[in-house]
Regions:
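Charged, terminal alpha-helix-loop-beta segments
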Residues: 2-477
Length: 477
């Protein structure tokens, strides 16, 4: 067996010897045939939907005719010819449309193709179970990304019979993708104009269940099923997402925090890190020091003075350095905390990041819990870039805060000392650059509970220099 580098060298030598001065389809096909022979097997993708693993001996090229695994196609064009991948445009007999055939050496697919293969296999595995459950035949399968309607390629869609539609999500997807099927189902329902069944992986429905309990209109507009890898069963609305409130006590580190912040008082910001029982000192959202009662650590190294000088050059508005684009939401959070009283009438001495905590959840959104001067809880969700799931992610946080507010968990665990928390629903505030609210934002917000107090704040796109409120929709109080 030739090693990959020697194979590539051999292929390039053969290709160089065969390459004519002008393009010649016959020579191009011969190059293709030789390249196929250099590998023991190939994985073939047909239009990104069907995947076949075929031995090289089972692939034949006769003139412009291509045969493999029981398929026969006429080669129209060899669009890309590389040592480990080939893309061919070909047409079946009596067909007017061409297929795109992608050949990948061996059984290992590049990441996008492997992802597509996994999702395709999942979609196919659902077909028999859907037919049994709905009592009708699946007539169409759809997997492509529908950007026009905001439905990603992570959500297989199927049509069944004349009046039913299905949308599902693979158990192997990340948590935000699984939870996003609720939003995708709403958009799919508007497109397909049929009764939609939503299939959720068994054991991964806690967040969706919590949302549906709070959103009866959505719960009743769809049929909800769970998939255990073999069968479909009705979704049970019993166990929602698990959250908890960590005890909070301000660590006795004032002197050390003051010493570090004095190095660059206009640039460094102390923020409580409740899980570590420490104070996190940040430069435009990046942690440069962590102070607890036992020690001070420096995640980016020390001494701090040259580090801060370097960060000030690289992580600044208008910079093209990668550090200027890293962790932008943390930067926006930092600017918002620094100007909080200019944006919202809340207490600066009672701002808690990531409270309460979500057990086992992947939350890629920044949450702040604070309180108004007169004791009303305020939940702040921050997004620096467009995210179609923002309304429902914000709902998750608000539901958790409300559950713990009603139970008195915040006061019991040391939050808001000396402040009387009003027995009223928390106000939900969503903050993002005005042009970064997704076009579906208004439509999804309309599904939120009518009793939820909501405030949308759109800030300027140049928030890295200075935050300015361009839109304030809703009421605080």
């Amino acid at each position: 067996m030739l090693c990959p580098d020697r194979k590539r060298f051999r292929f390039l030598m053969i290709r160089s010897a065969l390459m004519p001065r002008r393009y010649n389809p016959g020579v191009r096909a011969e190059e293709f045939r030789i390249l196929l022979a250099l590998e023991p097997s190939w994985t073939i993708s047909i239009n990104g939907r069907e995947f076949l693993h075929v031995r090289s001996s089972e692939i034949a090229i006769e003139g412009s005719r291509l045969r493999f695994g029981g398929f026969t196609r006429t080669i129209l064009d060899i669009e890309s010819l590389r040592p480990t991948s080939v893309r061919v445009r070909a047409r079946a007999r009596l067909r007017s449309t061409a297929d795109v055939l992608s050949f990948y050496s061996g059984e290992t697919l590049p990441s996008p193709a492997a992802l597509r293969q996994r999702r395709t296999a999942f979609q196919r595995s659902l077909v028999p179970a859907i037919s049994r459950h709905l009592g009708t035949r699946v007539t169409r399968q759809i997997l492509h990304s529908d950007k026009q309607h905001g439905i990603g390629g992570a959500y297989p869609r199927l049509l069944a019979g004349r009046s039913r539609a299905v949308i599902a999500v693979d158990p192997d997807e990340a948590t935000p993708v699984v939870n996003g099927v609720l939003r995708a189902a709403i958009h799919w329902s508007a497109v397909v104009k049929r009764r939609v069944t939503v299939i959720i992986p068994a054991g991964r429905s806690q967040t969706i269940v919590s949302r549906l309990v709070a959103l009866p209109r959505i719960r009743e507009s769809f049929d909800w099923l769970e998939w255990d890898g073999t069968d479909l069963a009705p979704l049970t609305f019993e166990q929602g997402m698990e959250t908890y409130v960590q005890p909070y006590s301000q660590p006795a580190v004032e002197a050390e925090v003051a010493r570090i912040v004095a190095i660059a008082p206009a640039l460094l910001q102390p923020v409580p890190h409740i899980a570590r029982r420490a104070v996190s000192i940040r430069f435009r959202g990046l942690e440069v020091a962590s102070v607890d009662e036992k020690a001070t650590t420096y995640p980016l190294g020390e001494p701090l003075e040259p580090l801060i000088e370097s960060l000030a050059r690289e992580r600044r508005p208008g910079s093209r350095h990668p550090l200027a684009r890293a962790h932008e939401e943390a930067w926006l959070e930092s600017n918002l905390i620094g100007r909080m009283r200019d944006v919202l009438p809340v207490r600066r001495d009672a701002i808690y990041p990531q409270v309460p905590s979500f057990r086992g959840e992947e939350r890629k959104i920044i949450d702040l819990l604070t309180i108004t001067d007169d004791g009303r809880l305020v939940v702040i969700e921050i997004k620096a870039s467009e995210d179609p799931d923002l309304p429902f992610q914000a709902l998750d946080y608000w539901l958790a805060v409300e559950r713990h507010r009603k139970a008195g968990d915040f006061e019991a665990n040391g939050y808001f000392r000396g402040i009387r928390v009003r027995n009223e629903p928390a106000i939900l505030v969503m903050v993002a650059p005005l042009l970064s609210f997704h076009r579906s934002f208004e439509r999804l917000v309309a599904f939120l509970p009518p009793a939820l107090p909501l405030l949308q704040i759109g800030v300027n796109q140049t928030w890295k220099r200075e935050i300015k409120v361009l839109r304030r929709r809703g009421a605080l109080g």
